[in-house]
């Protein structure tokens, strides 16, 4: 639920390495 300050429209979340995932074109952490 916390925005990771990253979008994932064209590329996956780089912040995925710390647990962020793509939701509605924005990377979120829980």
From Swiss-Prot:
Keyword Signal: no
GO BP annotation list: defense response
Keyword Amino-acid biosynthesis: no
Cyclopeptide (Gly-Asn) cross-link site: 1-30
A Pfam family recorded for this sequence: Cyclotide
Entry superkingdom: Eukaryota
InterPro entries xrefs: Cyclotide (IPR005535), Cyclotide_bracelet_CS (IPR012323), Cyclotide_sf (IPR036146)
Keywords: Disulfide bond, Knottin, Plant defense
Disulfide bond sites: 4-20, 8-22, 13-27
PTM text: This is a cyclic peptide.
Residue stretches in coiled coil: none
Entry remark concerning the domains of this protein: The presence of a 'disulfide through disulfide knot' structurally defines this protein as a knottin.
Family under the similarity heading: Belongs to the cyclotide family. Bracelet subfamily.
Functional summary from the UniProt entry: Probably participates in a plant defense mechanism.
Protein name: Kalata-B5
Biological classification of the source: Eukaryota, Viridiplantae, Streptophyta, Embryophyta, Tracheophyta
């Amino acid at each position: 639920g916390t925005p990771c300050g990253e979008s994932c429209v064209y590329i996956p979340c780089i912040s995925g390495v710390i647990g962020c995932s793509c939701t509605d074109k924005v990377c979120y952490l829980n």
